[in-house]
Amino acid sequence: MNVTLLIPARYGSSRFPGKPLAPINGKPMIQHVYERAALAKGLKDIYVATDDERIKNAVEGFGGKVVMTGADAASGTDRIDDAITQLGLADDDLVINLQGDQPLIDPISIEQLVSLCERHPGEFDMATLGVEIRDEAQINDPNHVKMVFDNNFNALYFSRATIPFGRESSDYPVYKHLGIYAYTRKFIQTFAKLPLGRLEDLEKLEQLRALEYGYKIKVAISAFDSPEVDTPEDIRICEARLAVD
């Protein structure tokens, strides 16, 4: 199974313009993401998918590969769909979609997701990762997406709200969704053609589109958290983590 990892990156962001190029310990954030991904075993290729020349120049400047996509991509998955069409991937090629705001992604987590797909081909439509929340402040923070899944690790729902809600007890694990997905080229093209989901639009979480249309998302639990960069303040958190990493 050929595995291609794509990192969608856009320059425009209402909360943090130019986020992919924000410096973290002297390197643009997108470089941290790319270099972490490059440490994962089993990947055939890694590309940044972007429509911005500044991001393109930065990635090529550190030796990375870029696919230029259209400026009208409505979501990261739409950008991925554009990129895989240009790359000419086969229908059954595995595509890893790693969000560009994950500068601390652990390569072992990427390998875990690839292994899940290789061991169970055709048993689900998408796969993703989660991690148990250890920091209570994240539980009620809408920037940290929570998820619930069944006894067979099939995703039931993703939400910015706190799920599950313990009516009589708070002594239970809460899991955070990590910004990484795996699927085949064929499924991405199917997914990208689906109309916007009602819940997807409400929560602003595109993975809900798959659940709303009856597709199965398999979940694996990682041992490694991967803090997302949503605001400039998150940069300092990443720099502190990298200092002891």
Curated annotation (Swiss-Prot):
Q: Per the record, what are the reactions this protein catalyses?
A: 8-amino-3,8-dideoxy-alpha-D-manno-octulosonate + CTP = CMP-8-amino-3,8-dideoxy-alpha-D-manno-oct-2-ulosonate + diphosphate
GO molecular function (one): 3-deoxy-manno-octulosonate cytidylyltransferase activity
The pathway that the record names for this protein is:
Bacterial outer membrane biogenesis; lipopolysaccharide biosynthesis
The domain of life for this entry's organism is Bacteria
**Where does it live in the cell?**
Cytoplasm
- Principal localization reads cytoplasm
Stated role:
Activates KDO8N (a required 8-carbon sugar) for incorporation into bacterial lipopolysaccharide in the Shewanella genus.
NCBIfam families listed in its UniProt record: kdsB, PRK05450.1-3, PRK05450.1-5, PRK13368.1
Q: What is its EC number?
A: 2.7.7.90
Q: HAMAP family given for it?
A: KdsB
Entry's Pfam families?
CTP_transf_3
Keyword tRNA-binding listed? The answer is no
Q: Name one GO cellular component term.
A: cytosol
The UniProt keywords, alphabetically, are: Cytoplasm, Lipopolysaccharide biosynthesis, Nucleotidyltransferase, Transferase
Q: What is this protein called?
A: 8-amino-3,8-dideoxy-manno-octulosonate cytidylyltransferase
Q: Which InterPro entries match?
A: Cytidylyl_trans, KdsB, Nucleotide-diphossugar_trans
What GO terms describe the biological role, i.e. biological process, of this protein? lipopolysaccharide biosynthetic process
- Family matches, as SUPFAM superfamilies: Nucleotide-diphospho-sugar transferases (SSF53448)
State the gene name recorded for this protein. kdsB
Q: Which organism is it from?
A: Shewanella halifaxensis (strain HAW-EB4)
Alphabetical list of Gene3D superfamilies matching this protein: Spore Coat Polysaccharide Biosynthesis Protein SpsA, Chain A
Q: Which family does it belong to?
A: Belongs to the KdsB family.
Q: Which top-level enzyme class is recorded in the Swiss-Prot or TrEMBL entry? A: transferase
